[in-house]
Amino acid sequence: MNIKATCIDYTKASVEEREAFSLVPSKIQELEQSILQTYQLDGCIILSTCNRTELWISAPKAVLSSLSPTAILCDALQVPVEQYLSFFIPYLRYGNSFRFRIHPQNRLR
């Protein structure tokens, strides 16, 4: 399975910066369907809690390699990616290997 993901959370962004990405369940469902159709993905999951928002997408490697989950999420929410890019943490998985950005104190970031 090929997966890319992105996360904006309290460790990199203030409450004010995260507000643009705060989502209620009905909006999450709407965005997931829109993203799936727009980008012809195999899968799409959005997780939104009080201190983080994540977008996980799945597609064939050839499709996924040209996609940025951060840009997709910003586009779907109509917020400028350039303004928020530095607050996001990317994740990547091709096949059986998963790569996270690891914080020096051994915490996932």
Regions found by a protein language model. Name each.
Residues 1-109:
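N-terminal ligand-binding/catalytic initiation module
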